[in-house]
Amino acid sequence: MAQQQKKRKKRKSKKFPLYMKSKLVVFFGILLACLCALIGRIMYIEYHNGEEYKKLVLSKQDYDSKIIPYQRGDILDTNGTVLATSVAVYNIILDCKVLTSDEKYIEPTVTALLSCFPKKLKEEEIRKYIAEEQKRAYIILAKGLSYDEVQKFVKLQEEVDDKGKKKNPDINGVWFETEYKRSYPYKTLAADVIGFTSAGDVGTTGLEHYYDDVLNGINGREYGYLNSNSDYEKTVIAPEDGDSIVISIDENIQAIVEEKIAEFNEAYTNNKTKGPGAKNIAVVMQNPNTGEIIAMASYPTFDLSKPRDLSAYYTKKQIKKMSQEETYAALNEIWKNYCVTETYEPGSVQKPFTVACGLETGTVKQSDTFYCDGYEVFGPDKIHCFDRSGHGTETVEGALMDSCNDSLMQMSYQIGAEKFLEYQSIFGFGQKTGIDLPGEAYTASLIYTLDKIKPVDLATNSFGQNYNCTMVQMISAFYSLINGGTYYQPHMLKKIVDAKGNTVSTYSPVALKQTVSSSTSALIREYLYHTVTSGTATSAKVDGYSLGGKTGTAQKYPRAEKNYLVSFMGFAPYENPQFVIYCVIDTPNVEDQAHSSYALNLTREILKEVYPYMNIYPDEEKTGVNEGKDITGAVGHDDAQLQDENGDGSIQDNQIPEETPGQENRQNGQDSQGEQDEQDEQDDPDNPE
């Protein structure tokens, strides 16, 4: 027994051998190193990938989330006037989880909702949600409420007594979600230029469509979730608001132009036939030294706040009878931007280009003369001048001043088809201008090619018939004729600014090419100045102000209908042009359409107000010219005098061939419209020309 106890004692006092101690030290060292490495790795992940893993964890947990909407950028005019903006509106959100969590919340909350929003909410609908949707935390009861409407409920909910306690603590389970609604302060102003948005802030037409990616931002999001301890936590990702664009349109000039278009339309509504004053009326003003669009307007137009409202043009009965296709066609007719998407035969405003081509190529000399006997012969047919008795001998300048078709046809023979078509291309006809607006028409198939053009086509092209262009093509080419020869890309954008007002980028004018020499440009400018002072365009002049320009009268296709498009292209001041203005009146509602006086009168009435606004001062002695005239030009002139004064090469019956480039396409509704951009406005009816 004693011996056994002695053995146990020896066993208890036995110590670890040295090699075992060494192993333990190594083991614990490795364990400590692993622990340090693990801690280091965790710290590294937290620093570099913390947000990623946080989102992963959140995605596995029970949570609610809501979108925090961005604010779409504004559209501002050149002076900073807001033309389009986004205003906050509010949705009423019902949280049935909270509302039904305590029976005492239900009646006070329902009563408060119905008293504050009697026209927006129905009691039976609210009670149905409470009975059937008790687990839902997000139910939209009403959308698009104003701040003032919402405040009535908020004040009731937060009202306190003298002790600072809530008077209505049992109003629960209701909150307000912020959204943004597009607002257009000037409603109809520049409607086809600005455009509008559809649901989800998607730009549908105009600048809203073209600059959709710039104006739009990125939605934020708020996540609410229960963590492992069942505590409610949330994380917020802030929205990124869209950038704003500043455009070259001047709201004041735009308003003047639109007011005068409306005045003209009213003056001739129900004149010859029941209907508007013209099928289309359009005006573009541009800065010839930059290509900036100063104003762009057309009729018919629409209210940007109610873009699908046709009541201005149709009765309720007519609208009700419309098929879906007819409704779309009617809407697209008012949404279209005539200045950009529509093509037409320009008429005599082409003549300065023919003269410039001849002078620039040396095929026409300044000293050349032409004899106008009233017509040119092409086989069995005669192409007449508007003065069938003939102008007699004409100089180059006189041919422009008198708008002599016969002289221009003779010039085209000297120029030849190859040079003529070459300069059509140099001036940009048949090509897109690249203007920053959607739906620009593609016109390559609407002008002649060298292998297709015949002598009669060259002759009629020389005075603006038998080829098609757009207004923006014509005015962009024209200002290169009078600014020294520089063709600037037409544009709307001036700069982009972020939500804090910082400039993101600035647009600089782009000089694309030289169309004519400065000497040719100076001659054309002089010829057109005399066309206003002593030629066919006198009625456009505002007494005391210098002005140059050219009239246009084009017979529309089909010729047998005897419809006309009349126009005037002008610039001022003569010595140092600050703007170019182009007025087009398509099918005026008058007995005798073939007179440019309608476009001249509209131009003059616009310029009366534009000159003082632009700080352009009188630079000539007053002579009393056009004194007392209104937009109809009736005062001081009878109709016969006006027609004689403004007979600018109007096209006589049967003098223009029926076949034109792209005629088949136009009949099938092709090429006379802008390309099919992904927007509602591109289903417009076929151009009738």
Regions found by a protein language model. Name each.
Residues 1-316, 418-425, 540-541, 559, ...:
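Periplasmic/cell-envelope proteins involved in peptidoglycan metabolism and beta-lactam response
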Residues 589:
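Hydrophobic alpha-helical positions that pack around
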Residues 82-85, 90, 229-236, 249, ...:
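Beta-lactam-recognizing serine transpeptidase/beta-lactamase-like catalytic domain environment
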